[in-house]
Amino acid sequence: MATSSMSKGCFVFKPNSKKRKISLPIEDYFNKGKNEPEDSKLRFETYQLIWQQMKSENERLQEELNKNLFDNLIEFLQKSHSGFQKNSRDLGGQIKLREIPTAALVLGVNVTDHDLTFGSLTEALQNNVTPYVVSLQAKDCPDMKHFLQKLISQLMDCCVDIKSKEEESVHVTQRKTHYSMDSLSSWYMTVTQKTDPKMLSKKRTTSSQWQSPPVVVILKDMESFATKVLQDFIIISSQHLHEFPLILIFGIATSPIIIHRLLPHAVSSLLCIELFQSLSCKEHLTTVLDKLLLTTQFPFKINEKVLQVLTNIFLYHDFSVQNFIKGLQLSLLEHFYSQPLSVLCCNLPEAKRRINFLSNNQCENIRRLPSFRRYVEKQASEKQVALLTNERYLKEETQLLLENLHVYHMNYFLVLRCLHKFTSSLPKYPLGRQIRELYCTCLEKNIWDSEEYASVLQLLRMLAKDELMTILEKCFKVFKSYCENHLGSTAKRIEEFLAQFQSLDETKEEEDASGSQPKGLQKTDLYHLQKSLLEMKELRRSKKQTKFEVLRENVVNFIDCLVREYLLPPETQPLHEVVYFSAAHALREHLNAAPRIALHTALNNPYYYLKNEALKSEEGCIPNIAPDICIAYKLHLECSRLINLVDWSEAFATVVTAAEKMDANSATSEEMNEIIHARFIRAVSELELLGFIKPTKQKTDHVARLTWGGC
């Protein structure tokens, strides 16, 4: 490698390839404990496959849920744009052009999901309405200058094709420092004149729209925009509306009333507002659960505690469906990482194939499962010996148990949906209004042992004929869609109930019931009145049930039998640990982290995170090789409300130089003291940044301590 040169220069040489750090594949990090590398790689690949399938299903579901909303928005924009073209040719319609078409899009308080929705909306508008779609956020537009700057700069990037982009580059550079509505109007006229509608008609449905495509401005978080900025922009835009078609979309998280609170009547009258409501986040979550968890399409499941952690974060923190899905992904990852037998958490044919190739260690892992041990204890003594000693017999039995678990899930979700059809129509919703609430209860315990279930049966025995028939028709559709399952006979039984209800002669029943009733009470004293009431009560008890009441009782008993037979908790099923993730504490540590406790642990015991053996120390001791901030933090824990900086600095220097022998009069010692002093200042500044201390006006050479209790 020659470095000779006629002039001074900097020479760069690539390092030796042998010295480069070789990065390990991801599946190697997936290995834990004594598990075999081949098995860890297979588990990682299975995790990736299942997550990719769940992710694709969620994306498809998201598009399906947004389709109706986006279609209505696109129809509104196209209608507003056609109105602009019509009025631009009509002199009498110039007054209407003062009103800006505005779509008020209410998305709910799940703000973290809005970016995904607006991204999909922007793509849909660019594909169906106009290429000129701009998304603005309040943090980027503190005043009118920045508002116009962001608006125009984004619009100039929205070029229709490469040719127009090249032609516009000259004009953009000439006016890049001048942002106003006049420049925007001039730019729009230039772009629309240069755009060839014949070339672009292939990309859109009608070429007439491309002669003057609208400019769509999306304000993602309208509540956060400054009132003056909004008012000025709307007033100025209304004056230029005859020059280019402008359409506004307000992203609203709270309520449409915010429009009238932010904008006075003189400004809001310049808007032609139409309201659009997205699906509520709770309904969205219910749909996601129904498609991802309440199905046999995906083998992975979570138990009641994990589901409770995820739903609590959703309900009490952010209402974010995307964060819920991320938590579900983390649960999937933790399950495949921590459970060696998760290699069998796949579709049933593949799981049966993998069972034949299980190693001896994996067979022992199966025998150690609590659910399998309970299953073995219930078997005969000969079968117990075979399960514990014969590997081949164990694999055959494992295949059978996994097949039974698959059938259990199919029946479980069918009966769960059927029960939800009944409970969701009852007053006060004893078992919850959403199916996720019913699912949580069924996962936790035997639902028929709860008081809420008893009240449900009591209310079902009071349903009218029309209500009961409506619910049975819904249940019939649920079971009819799974005829291949042995529960398909249940659909025939429900169909028989419906036929019996339709054949009832209500008129005759009412006449018979009215004929058996006693005559009306006459005026009498208290004694005879009480006697008559007692006779009526006894008569009501001994009264024969009508055909409808008998049939209704049969329906309730039939549903009760289904629930008791098929809605058993998952913990009762052998090998449920293979597909169910139950480590709720691990999930809570990741998703519900406590920053203050983590900070205290890191500063008080750096070995906990750094895993450096030299940092190990007895409780109460301060190792001198610990990070400076850790030393300063442990010293500040020994102080009271006010900390003397001089004393703190001396104690810090004493700890740092504890293992070093230096001459106090040497030049090296003075340089070392300066370095230690600088390190102390940096450590104190870091503690102040973290919020442990703050300056105080009581004493200039002191700082105030802000935390107590060791965390």
Curated annotation (Swiss-Prot):
It is found in: Nucleus; Chromosome. It holds the Pfam family ORC3_ins. GO terms for biological process: DNA replication; DNA replication initiation; glial cell proliferation; neural precursor cell proliferation; regulation of DNA replication. One of its GO terms (molecular function) is DNA replication origin binding. Multi-mono-ubiquitinated by OBI1; ubiquitination is important for efficient DNA replication origin site activation. Ubiquitination levels are low in mitotic and early G1-phAse cells and are induced in late G1-/early S-phase, peaking in S-phase and decrease toward the end of the cell cycle. It comes from the Eukaryota. Keywords: Chromosome, DNA replication, DNA-binding, Nucleus, Phosphoprotein, Ubl conjugation. The modification Phosphoserine is found at S23, S516. One of its GO terms (cellular component) is nucleoplasm. Component of the origin recognition complex (ORC) that binds origins of replication. DNA-binding is ATP-dependent. The specific DNA sequences that define origins of replication have not been identified yet. ORC is required to assemble the pre-replication complex necessary to initiate DNA replication. Binds histone H3 and H4 trimethylation marks H3K9me3, H3K27me3 and H4K20me3. PANTHER family: ORIGIN RECOGNITION COMPLEX SUBUNIT 3. Component of ORC, a complex composed of at least 6 subunits: ORC1, ORC2, ORC3, ORC4, ORC5 and ORC6. ORC is regulated in a cell-cycle dependent manner. It is sequentially assembled at the exit from anaphase of mitosis and disassembled as cells enter S phase. Belongs to the ORC3 family. This is Origin recognition complex subunit 3. It comes from Homo sapiens.
